[in-house]
From Swiss-Prot:
Keyword annotations from UniProtKB, A to Z: Hydrolase, Metal-binding, Pyrimidine biosynthesis, Zinc
Annotated gene: pyrC
Organism: Salmonella typhimurium (strain LT2 / SGSC1412 / ATCC 700720)
UniProt modified residues of type N6-carboxylysine: 103
Entries under HAMAP family matching the protein: PyrC_classII
Protein name as catalogued: Dihydroorotase
Function: Catalyzes the reversible cyclization of carbamoyl aspartate to dihydroorotate.
Lineage, highest ranks first: Bacteria, Pseudomonadati, Pseudomonadota, Gammaproteobacteria, Enterobacterales
């Protein structure tokens, strides 16, 4: 019997979905991403969403100002789609190398999404321009109708929004972000080369029992919400199969402790400090380490048409405890897996 690997060396990965926030929060969390990842797709859902080229340039500079010396990191900016967005502004940003993609948030689906799209028809001219130019559409795939159960939002979105959209714009590049259901896993698997998906570590590691049984665990609460174990298993099987249109997207989404541990807590897991090791643990459990590098470092660039990173990252089998909290101005952050011991960690 072969002894398990003690070191995993992979091409430097990218994070294809991250929230870096702004202000003191941004300064606190950026180094956890820039230390490990060569690039990251930065979500545009600030309190004042990123809808113009100038706003994206200014935000990118604030991110770069927070990157520690010695970190080689490129933030990839996204445009927040609204019903009133000017397609010419998006095209200009894309041609000038400011916007890498555009993000569709259904109105009120998640944090700072009140400015989001009320219907796909409202932005069809923008989407048609994106299809023509090859700009990827990043989708938070949930309906937000009051009569739809929160655990059914993703499956309903596929039937009522995603599939009609892709039938109408057959060459539009779409990333179905943070998929959480067997329905989405099968839908992406059955799709063509214009459809891909990101998957978070929390949706691979946990299901709704982990969040709700024996007491509510607010630091596992995110949107889309954790689902049944049958959905978790479908996601694990998808990545373990070596499927090439699924790739790393942490959806690391920090909120201060007092905004998570409250009677009406915010959605989001701050997983940047432990995400890569968490993914490695899942792939190891699934006997799929042969596909780990592709998921982290190859599949994303291939879909986006970008070069692979040239550097390397090593993970070592070295049990380490995740800190219980991280200082944040006059508050703190509780990271994903706080206080728990993980078996894979990034070599410093």
């Amino acid at each position: 019997m072969t002894a398990p690997s003690q070191v995993l060396k992979i091409r430097r990965p990218d994070d294809w979905h991250v929230h870096l926030r702004d202000g003191d929060m941004l300064k606190t969390v950026v180094p956890y991403t820039s230390e490990i990842y060569g690039r990251a797709i930065v979500m545009p859902n600030l309190a004042s969403p990123i809808t113009t080229v100038d706003a994206a340039i200014a935000y990118r500079q604030r991110i770069l100002d927070a990157v520690p010396a010695g970190h080689d990191f490129t933030p990839l900016m996204t445009c927040y789609l609204t019903d009133s967005l000017d397609a010419d502004e998006l095209e200009r940003g894309f041609h000038e190398g400011v916007f890498t993609a555009a993000k569709l948030y259904p109105a009120n689906a998640t944090t700072n999404s009140s400015h989001g799209v009320t219907s796909v028809d409202a932005i069809m001219p923008v989407l048609e321009r994106m299809e023509k130019l090859g700009i990827p559409l990043l989708v938070h795939g949930e309906v937000t109708h009051a009569d739809v159960d929160i655990f059914d939002r993703e499956a309903r979105f596929i039937d009522t929004v995603m599939e009609p959209l892709r039938q109408r714009l057959t060459a539009l590049k779409v990333v179905f972000e943070h998929i959480t259901t067997k329905d989405a896993a099968q839908y992406v698997r059955d799709g063509n080369d214009y459809l891909a998906a990101t998957i978070t570590p929390q949706h691979l590691m946990f299901n709704r029992n982990d969040m709700l049984v024996g007491g509510i665990r607010p630091h596992l609460y995110c949107l889309p919400i954790l689902k049944r174990n049958i959905h978790q298993q479908a996601l694990r099987e998808l990545v373990a199969s070596g499927f090439t249109r699924a790739f790393l997207g942490t959806d690391s989404a920090p909120h201060s402790r007092h905004r998570k541990e409250t009677s009406c807590g915010c959605a989001g897991c701050f997983n940047a400090p432990s995400a890569l090791g968490s993914y490695a643990a899942v792939f190891e459990e699934m006997n799929a380490l042969a596909h780990f590098e592709a998921f982290c470092s190859l599949n994303g660039p291939q879909f986006y048409g970008l070069p692979m990173n040239t550097g390397w990252v090593e993970l070592v089998r070295d049990e380490q405890q995740i800190p219980g909290n991280i200082a944040l101005a006059d508050d703190s952050l509780v990271p994903f897996l706080a206080g728990e011991t993980v078996r894979w960690s990034v070599k410093k």
